[in-house]
Amino acid sequence: MGAPKQRWTSEEEAALRAGVARHGVGNWRMILNDPELSSTLRYRSNVDLKDKWRNMNVIVTSSSTRDRGRTSTRRTRAAPKNNDQLLAMSTITSEVDDEIVDVKPIVSMSVEGWNTSNSKKSHSRLDNIIMEAIKNLNEPTGSHRTTIANYIEEQYWPPSDFDHLLSAKLKYLATSGKLLKVNRKYRIAPSLLEDVQREPLKLGSDASRTLTRSQVDAELVRMATMTVEAAAAAAAHAVAEAEAIMAEAEAAAREAEAAEAEARAAQAFAEAAVLTLKNRNAAKLV
């Protein structure tokens, strides 16, 4: 286990804000290498900066009564104006920094539209994202799971259990014949490759859309100028979306496990059939 992460200091938060103002959202490595900021942020990584910036700009309300009570108290305060608005947002989010839920949605969707049929569509979109990664990587011998994961993480905001979800999806796609797995590398099946090249992947629909990192960063900047009430409402919606993504991940894992069980049963049946045939041939020879 690594060393426990230290709580962010006010100097580090100020340095992060200055770095974002100077280099822009998403340029975490440039911020860490900035001569004026590197000494203050020397104990922080790219991921630390990304997560902290997201937490500083999104207020997430938990389901406990205590948190709801605290949120209600904040909402009774007069809404700040102009520049005081951003300062109030930063102060409040700093107070609840340790209680903020790590929300990293890979797909944004309306909660009302989340049902069984939409769950199947979401699975299809995740399949397409994996297909897109393998197609764009275009490696002759196929792409390793780590390479696929890195590509998706660069293009989208994956959920916290992304590794488990990706492994389950790759196993399911390989079992169903959509992907070929050779030496731990994945390639698109030849029968599907022509369809993928002929028809562009459609990752969105009327009920949902896939957000890239740049779009998410732009959304966070927009949320920084919201009132406390509007930001709290948006954060609550983000929590609901994250819960929907978790439900999707669990369903995908169950689907992959079911497919694996079917494959094992089919293999056992085939082995039993071969053994029966051998026994019959042996009996005839006797």
Curated annotation (Swiss-Prot):
Ranges where the H15 domain occurs: 122-190
Gene from which the chain derives: SMH5
MF (Gene Ontology): double-stranded telomeric DNA binding; protein homodimerization activity; single-stranded telomeric DNA binding
Complex formation: Forms a homodimer and heterodimers.
Subcellular location: Nucleus; Chromosome; Nucleus, Nucleolus; Chromosome, Telomere
Listed GO CC annotations: chromatin; chromosome, telomeric region; nucleolus; nucleosome; nucleus
Superkingdom of the source species: Eukaryota
Keyword hit for Transcription regulation: yes
DNA-binding positions: 28-57
Primary site of residence: nucleus
Annotated domain remarks: HTH myb-type domain confers double-stranded telomeric DNA-binding while the H15 domain is involved in non-specific DNA-protein interaction and multimerization.
GO biological process, one term: nucleosome assembly
Identification of the protein by name: Single myb histone 5
Annotated function: Binds preferentially double-stranded telomeric repeats, but may also bind to the single telomeric strand.
Limits of the HTH myb-type domain: 1-61
Species assigned in the record: Zea mays (Maize)
PANTHER family, alphabetized: SINGLE MYB HISTONE 4, SINGLE MYB HISTONE 5
Coiled-coil region(s): 229-277
Pfam families attached to this UniProt entry: Linker_histone (PF00538), Myb_DNA-binding (PF00249)
Taxonomy of the source species: Eukaryota, Viridiplantae, Streptophyta, Embryophyta, Tracheophyta
Disulfide bonds: none
Sorted UniProt keywords: Chromosome, Coiled coil, DNA-binding, Nucleus, Telomere, Transcription, Transcription regulation
Family: Belongs to the histone H1/H5 family. SMH subfamily.
